[in-house]
UniProtKB/Swiss-Prot annotation:
This is Late transcription unit B protein. It holds the Pfam family LtuB. InterPro entries: LtuB. It comes from the Bacteria.
Length: 97
């Protein structure tokens, strides 16, 4: 013979109903969060594109000025930004990978 089914107490039943109802009610919030993420990604893409254009203009202008002096090399250093350096002092800015 099988075990008789346990009946839930009123408190346990109320907790189960509350748990299930909150799961159902939270779903639209998840959907809203997904839409919000898409908006943020689109906004970030615009700012990244704008920053990339500014960076491109900066690099092009620096490269144009480098053509005048062929003994110097243009490098990017995180401490100083873009730096013109002689080929002899290039190792000062290089890093090991």
């Amino acid at each position: 013979m099988g075990k008789p089914k346990k009946s839930r107490t009123d408190r346990a039943l109320a907790q189960e109903i509350q748990k299930k109802s909150t799961e159902v009610l939270k779903k639209p919030a998840r959907i809203k969060a997904k839409n919000r993420r898409k908006f943020l990604i689109a906004k970030e893409q615009k700012t990244l594109k704008h920053r990339a254009q500014e960076y491109d203009q900066l690099v092009r202008s620096l490269l144009d000025s480098q053509k005048k002096d062929t003994d110097k090399v243009l490098i990017f250093n995180y401490e100083n930004g873009f730096v013109f350096t002689d080929k002899d002092h290039f190792s000062k800015y290089s890093i090991r990978l």
